[in-house]
């Protein structure tokens, strides 16, 4: 594949300025080198933001908000529709770039762009349904209702594992709701951010929309802190590790600002004796090795009943033996590389912790040779048999390591094991028994934001709200009523009588005012 032609098709320079609000590209900060984990090649460099670049973008965004918020929501929906069409035109090239810069398989890269298209379609319909609620007033000749208004400037901080889709979840809903956006992409995938900004800028220019409605701000974690600390940023939507999310929450909370956090997951599949084992196997393998185990919703734990433990262990081992690892742009391969060598170091550290904490290896894993694979970022997926209370099991291991855990009793025991970790993003049960599945979905069942039956933990549709509980952050993005996080809520009471009755039946004698 000729990388330069791909970058040219997406309007990316090899030496690229990293800040943009719709006019000229700028950026005088630190240079960020983008290396492909596929073969270790240098794809390009992006010059990040200084504080002066940041202020320049923020000024543009604040000015743009004043005019953008008064555009009717269905008209803003038309802009999102056009963005979706641009993404359809660029789907293959953008999907290739995602695979090239991040390392996920081409099928997953294309799927990520399709997710962007889907959220645009969803948001277009939503633009005519930003409805409030009308309530019955206790006072005669009064009307009581709620409505929603735009927030202002929304700051988006995204992670490397979904370098384009998470941005689209935010910008599509934020636009529909009348907000403007400043996006700080991961410094590990800056070129994906450049490509998206070029695409969205075409839509804005063609519609003569003010500069500043969509801004790009490349840089390191220091740049993210600027967004989190700035009281002019009405909402900070941050996706990443729990450690990062705690820092963002602390900074935004210190100014009593709004934050939307989608953080780590330690996702489990419960497999009961009543499971369809073929379905369970497919869900477990894709969940564990898809995106090389670097999805927020990747399957980290399999909680399997003792009666089927040995049988499932055998078929799982056979399935892993058939996985093809290699260049993610080759559609024959199931799994590509980890994002970088730091991720490989964390993978090796986790394997050592498994050894020291009494685990054994069903599939031992290991780092693959650079000479055969093109970079130092390729690893083997691993499966460890380990106790549910081992410390490593309670951490989010952002790598293709699957922890195989046995339970002996009822489904309630399995649910308790699932819920004992600090994270609460995604969960799943494999069972054809209605009592087991309904228990799992009940208020005493899974404590996660996502609870699935007979599908895996990974691969959420955009129609549902996406997010989790506990150390996952509590925020919700994407579908359902997640749009409400991007608006300020207002309660209105209208009096169309000639009197001024007070709520709760309070009597206030004011007749003497007229004397």
Where are the regions that the model predicts?
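Hydrophobic face of amphipathic alpha-helices that form TPR/SEL1-like repeat modules
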Residues: 1-39
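Residue-level signal for inorganic ion chemistry
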Residues: 40, 76, 98, 120, ...
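Glycine-rich loop-to-alpha-helix module at the N-terminal edge of alpha/beta enzyme cores
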Residues: 41-130, 141
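Short, well-ordered beta-strand elements within core beta-sheets of diverse protein domains
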Residues: 42-49, 64-70, 156, 269-272, ...
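Generic secondary-structure signature for well-ordered alpha-helical cores
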Residues: 63-67, 85-92, 103, 125-132, ...
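Rossmann-like NAD(P) dinucleotide-binding subdomain of oxidoreductase/dehydrogenase enzymes
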Residues: 132-279
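ALDH superfamily catalytic-core signature
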Residues: 199-202, 243-388, 412, 416, ...
């Amino acid at each position: 594949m000729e990388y330069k032609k791909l970058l040219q098709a997406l309007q990316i320079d090899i030496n690229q300025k990293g800040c943009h609000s719709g006019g000229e590209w700028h950026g005088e900060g630190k240079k960020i080198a983008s290396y492909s984990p596929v073969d270790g090649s240098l794809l390009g460099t992006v010059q990040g933001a200084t504080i002066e670049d940041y202020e320049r973008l923020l000024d543009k965004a604040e000015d743009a908000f004043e005019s953008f918020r008064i555009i009717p929501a269905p008209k803003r929906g038309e802009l999102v529709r056009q963005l979706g069409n641009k993404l359809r035109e660029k789907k293959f090239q953008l999907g290739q770039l995602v695979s090239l810069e991040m390392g996920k398989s081409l099928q997953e890269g294309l799927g990520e762009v399709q997710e962007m298209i889907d959220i645009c379609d969803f948001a277009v319909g939503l633009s005519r349904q930003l409805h409030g609620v009308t309530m019955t007033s206790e006072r005669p000749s009064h009307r009581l209702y709620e409505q929603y208004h735009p927030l202002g400037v929304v700051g988006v901080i995204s992670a490397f594992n979904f370098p384009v889709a998470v941005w689209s979840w935010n910008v599509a809903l934020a636009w529909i709701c009348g907000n403007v956006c400043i996006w700080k992409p991961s410094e590990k995938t800056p070129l994906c951010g450049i490509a998206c900004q070029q695409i969205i800028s075409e839509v804005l220019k063609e519609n003569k929309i003010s500069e500043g409605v969509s801004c790009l701000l490349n840089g390191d974690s220091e740049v993210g802190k600027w967004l989190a600390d700035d009281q002019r940023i009405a909402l900070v939507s941050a996706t990443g590790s729990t450690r990062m999310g705690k820092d963002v929450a602390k900074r935004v909370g210190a100014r009593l600002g709004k934050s939307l956090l989608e953080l780590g997951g330690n996702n489990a599949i419960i497999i009961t004796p009543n499971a369809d084992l073929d379905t369970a196997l497919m869900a477990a393998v894709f969940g564990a090795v898809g995106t090389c185990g670097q999805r927020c919703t990747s399957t980290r734990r399999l909680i399997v009943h003792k009666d089927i433990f040995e049988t499932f262990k055998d078929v799982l081992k056979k399935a892993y033996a058939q996985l093809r690892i290699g260049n993610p742009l080759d559609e024959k391969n199931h799994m590509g590389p980890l994002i970088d060598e730091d991720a490989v170091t964390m993978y090796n550290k986790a394997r050592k912790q498994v050894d020291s904490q009494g685990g054994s290896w069903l599939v031992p894993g290991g780092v693959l040779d650079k000479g055969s694979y093109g970079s130092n970022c390729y690893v083997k997926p691993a499966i460890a048999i380990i106790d549910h209370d081992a410390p490593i099991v309670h951490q989010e291991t952002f790598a293709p390591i699957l922890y195989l855990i046995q339970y002996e009793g009822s489904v309630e025991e399995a649910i308790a094991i699932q819920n004992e970790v600090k994270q609460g993003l995604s969960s799943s049960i494999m069972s054809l028994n209605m009592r087991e599945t309904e228990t799992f979905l009940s208020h005493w069942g899974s404590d996660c934001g996502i609870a699935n039956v007979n599908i895996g933990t990974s691969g959420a549709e955009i129609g549902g709200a996406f997010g989790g509980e506990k150390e996952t952050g509590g925020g919700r993005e994407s579908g359902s009523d997640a749009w409400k996080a991007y608006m300020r809520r207002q309660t209105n009471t209208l009096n169309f009588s000639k009197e001024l009755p007070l709520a709760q039946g309070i009597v206030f004698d004011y007749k003497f005012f007229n004397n």
